[in-house]
């Protein structure tokens, strides 16, 4: 699709990376925030893809992330 979101819906960070694209060209992209690692498909509803529609109770700030008590580790890949 080549049209990345300008900010993360969860933490408003502006570093968004493209992780994957639809096997059917132009249908959807999978993108990820560079700060909170929130990941979404570009065809998800607005409450998952737009900061102004994202639920307030799930929004994070840079301070929230820095002061998180525990960030779960990513488990090793299965072989």
From Swiss-Prot:
Sorted UniProt keywords: Aromatic hydrocarbons catabolism, Detoxification
Transmembrane segments: none
InterPro entries: VdcD-like
GO biological process terms on file: catabolic process; response to toxic substance
Highest taxon of source: Bacteria
Up-regulation conditions: By vanillate.
Signal peptide stretch: none
Entry annotated with the keyword Oxidoreductase: no
UniProt cross-references to NCBIfam families, sorted A to Z: VdcD
Function according to Swiss-Prot or TrEMBL: Involved in the non-oxidative decarboxylation and detoxification of phenolic derivatives under both aerobic and anaerobic conditions, however the precise biochemical function of VdcD in metabolism of phenolic acid is unknown.
Further facts: It is not known, if phenolic acid decarboxylase forms a complex composed of VdcB, VdcC and VdcD. The term subunit is often used in reference to the operon, however there is no experimental evidence to prove the existence of the complex.
UniProt name for this protein: Protein VdcD
Organism: Streptomyces sp. (strain D7)
Gene: vdcD
């Amino acid at each position: 699709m080549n049209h990345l979101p300008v900010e993360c819906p969860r933490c408003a960070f502006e570093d968004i990376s493209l992780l994957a694209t639809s096997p059917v060209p132009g249908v959807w992209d999978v993108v990820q925030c560079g700060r909170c690692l929130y990941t979404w498909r570009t065809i998800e509803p607005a409450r998952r893809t737009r900061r102004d529609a994202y639920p307030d109770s799930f929004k994070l700030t840079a301070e929230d992330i820095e002061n998180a008590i525990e960030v779960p580790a990513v488990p090793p890949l299965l072989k």
